[in-house]
Amino acid sequence: MESIDKIQGTFDAKGKEARPAVSDAVIKRLPRYHRYLGELIADGRLRISSAELSQIMNVTASQIRQDLNCFGGFGQQGYGYNIKYLYGKISELLGVTQGYSAVIVGAGNLGRALAATHMFGRRGVERLAMFDIDPKVVGEEIYGIKVYHVDELYEFCRRNEVTIGVLTVPKEAAYNVAMIMAHAGVKGIWNFANMELELEDRSVTVENIHLGDSLMKLCYEIKTRGEEKEIEE
């Protein structure tokens, strides 16, 4: 099995081997690999072929091999993939093993729902705190996470070296809160505010989540299939 560090590609200015550019499409598939491989481990599986994995992923076996070859391959001819090994390597690629931490800003319905989920811990992200401006919730604990006043956000993030900021605030407040987090050293922002957030500081990665867009895509698919059925009839 090839090491994750032994990736063929170009060399940087210091003579070190550089990882080739990876497409967004491949990056978006990595969490799916991680999820499905985790399920296979839970089922007691030890290895899997690219053909079988392609059926689970609903992509071609060739695409599976191309995706994984971007990071070194990880497979053996005639054996396929060691599931635990591949799961571990993809966990490394996704940062699951980095010990990232997060704060949630906004203790409304969405913020509370995110606080309740086990999603963070299962992906190696520790939720340290929540923040809000409502005096009725400041000082409380929501699913075991203490709520602080947003005025404490900057100092808390700096002191605890917070990696990820989760925004569940009204769109009018999103930019200012994001700037506070960026100045405090937060490396990434998961934005659920109803706006497209862009920061001048390109060292901060922003992932804009629009739940409404996903709902409208579903509505479109339902409508389109309904129209196709009418035509067939």
What are these regions (language model features)?
Residues R47, A51, I56-G99:
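HTH-adjacent hinge/linker in prokaryotic transcriptional regulators
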Residues M1-L46:
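Extreme N-terminal segment that seeds HTH/winged-HTH DNA-binding domains in transcriptional regulators
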Residues G38-I41, I145-E233:
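Phosphate-bearing ligand-interacting subdomains
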Residues G111:
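N-terminal Rossmann-fold NAD(P) dinucleotide-binding loop
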Residues R122-Y143:
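NAD(P)-binding Rossmann-fold cofactor-contacting core
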Residues A107-G108:
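Glycine-rich Rossmann-fold phosphate-binding loop(s) that bind the pyrophosphate
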